[in-house]
């Protein structure tokens, strides 16, 4: 057997003569080697040009938008009074400006300002009422002082600041329509309506005065009449604001006029109001003595203006503190908690639309009273003065007056009235008076 035979190989033989060594990358060889490349080519132009944005652009986008102050409305010939039973004090006279603080696309706060002296916030938890073509009033709960924590409930209710706004409305009707729209958007606004044949208070000076005339000889006459006007309506405004604050705190953004403004013998009360107005006008010069309570309210007015200015400056500088503007009852209520949770850290201007939340009993009873009462008016003056002239100075309760100025809430009204039964005005009055009397007794016991 021959030994020259080669043993079989375990691996196949590789022909290295056809292997091409890798060539360096060049423009000339890229086209020739494109077919031999195992991976697809990548075009750099198809990639995103700048995956990471410029750091300066990132910083500017994350910064909070700059807050600005906008004047959305200016009306000439405005006069503001602090409404008081003894003597309504004039606070300022000049141009009315509605200011809006805006941060980006968000409205942070809205203020009303007259001249450079008085300024107050417009919020959905504070009532604003249009009495007629020339008169508005605003009810504000002032910033609580530390030493007032031990005051009684009645004293706390009397701490409401009521501002009476009088406009020289001659020739400014379109501007006042804009004002009504703004108040409807940013406050708990109610426009009262009166019948054409009714003239609650014989006061037409403001309506027949233009802003130019207010700067001349007519100014003194208008000032006297406005002081008398707001002093006359002071009891009604205080009762109204007390009820409005309670209903708003319970989740209602609007009062039901059928209940709050119902009453008999309307003409007697209108005559009483006109006589009272004439007396105030004839004695306006003598009634210059301001009560101690009025002096305290004047101090609170200044504090409210200063607080409003602080908030405006805080918003413009990026630091906002607004809790002082809202009463604790609103903050602690369920509706208030939902409201304040909408825009944390901002002055809340969201809607507290509570008309649908008011119980059906009040609506049904209110509509029934409106239909069955012989003479019903929606004027402020009718809210206080009772069924007879002799009851005007009486401390007794009536269906259209004091009964709704007590410590009522919408939930107690629901318990007092039955919506399924057709209630007469007399039975409504009895129910209201009984409930109000119980509340007054409880208040006296607690004060003792």
From Swiss-Prot:
Keywords noted in UniProt? Chloroplast, Plastid, Transit peptide
Biased region (Basic residues) positions are 439-448
> For the region Disordered, what residue ranges are annotated?
1-36, 422-448
Q: Induced by what?
A: By salt stress (e.g. NaCl) and cold. Induced by P.tabacina.
InterPro entries cross-referenced by the UniProt entry: Senescence/spartin_C, Spartin-like
The tissues where this chain's protein is expressed are given as: Expressed in leaves (especially in midribs and trichomes), apical meristemic regions, stems, roots and flowers.
Q: Which residues form a coiled coil?
A: none
Q: Which GO terms describe its cellular component?
A: chloroplast
- Give the residue range of the signal peptide: none
In the UniProt record, the transit peptide is located at 1-56
Disulfide cross-links: none
Could you tell me where the Low complexity compositional bias lies?
26-36
| Lineage top rank: taxon | Eukaryota
Subcellular compartments? Plastid, Chloroplast
Q: Where is the Senescence domain?
A: 248-416
One GO BP annotation of this record = response to salt stress
Q: What is this protein called?
A: Senescence/dehydration-associated protein At4g35985, chloroplastic
Gene (UniProt): P85
């Amino acid at each position: 057997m021959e030994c020259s035979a080669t043993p079989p190989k375990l691996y196949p033989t590789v022909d290295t003569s056809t292997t091409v060594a890798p060539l360096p990358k060049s423009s000339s060889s890229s086209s020739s080697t494109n077919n031999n490349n195992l991976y697809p080519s990548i075009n750099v132009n198809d990639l995103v040009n700048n995956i990471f944005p410029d750091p300066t652009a990132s910083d500017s986008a994350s910064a909070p938008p700059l807050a600005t102050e906008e004047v959305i409305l200016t009306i000439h010939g405005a006069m503001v009074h602090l409404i008081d039973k003894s003597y309504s004090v004039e606070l300022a006279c000049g141009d009315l400006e509605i200011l809006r603080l805006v941060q980006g696309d968000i409205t942070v706060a809205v203020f009303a300002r007259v001249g450079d002296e008085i300024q107050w916030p417009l919020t959905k938890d504070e009532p604003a009422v249009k009495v007629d073509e020339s008169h508005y009033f605003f009810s504000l709960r002032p910033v609580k002082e530390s030493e007032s924590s031990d005051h009684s409930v009645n004293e706390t209710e009397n701490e409401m600041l009521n501002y009476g706004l009088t406009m020289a409305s001659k020739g400014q009707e379109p501007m006042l329509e804009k004002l009504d729209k703004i108040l409807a958007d940013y406050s708990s606004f109610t426009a009262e309506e009166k019948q054409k044949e009714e003239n609650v208070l014989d006061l037409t000076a403001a309506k027949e005065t233009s802003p130019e005339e207010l700067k001349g000889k007519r100014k003194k006459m208008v000032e006297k009449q406005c002081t008398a006007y707001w002093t006359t309506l002071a009891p009604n405004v205080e009762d109204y604001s007390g009820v409005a604050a309670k209903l708003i705190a319970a989740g209602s953004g609007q009062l039901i006029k059928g209940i709050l403004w119902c009453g008999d013998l309307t003409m007697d009360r209108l005559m009483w109001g006109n006589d009272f107005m004439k007396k105030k006008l004839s004695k306006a010069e003598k009634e210059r003595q301001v009560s101690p309570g009025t002096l305290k309210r004047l101090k609170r007015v200044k504090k409210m203006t200063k607080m409003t200015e602080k908030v405006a400056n805080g918003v413009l500088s990026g630091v906002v503190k607004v809790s002082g503007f809202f009463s604790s009852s609103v903050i602690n209520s369920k509706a208030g908690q939902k409201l304040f949770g909408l825009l944390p850290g901002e002055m809340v201007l969201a809607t507290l639309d509570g008309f649908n939340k008011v119980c059906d009993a009040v609506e049904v009873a209110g509509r029934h009273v409106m239909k069955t009462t012989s003479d019903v008016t929606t004027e402020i003056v009718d809210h206080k003065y009772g069924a007879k002239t002799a009851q005007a100075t009486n401390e007794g309760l009536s269906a259209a007056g004091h009964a709704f100025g007590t410590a009522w809430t919408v939930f107690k009204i629901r318990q007092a009235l039955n919506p399924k039964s057709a209630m007469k005005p007399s039975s409504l009055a009895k129910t209201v008076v009984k409930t109000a009397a119980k509340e007054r007794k409880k208040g006296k016991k607690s004060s003792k």
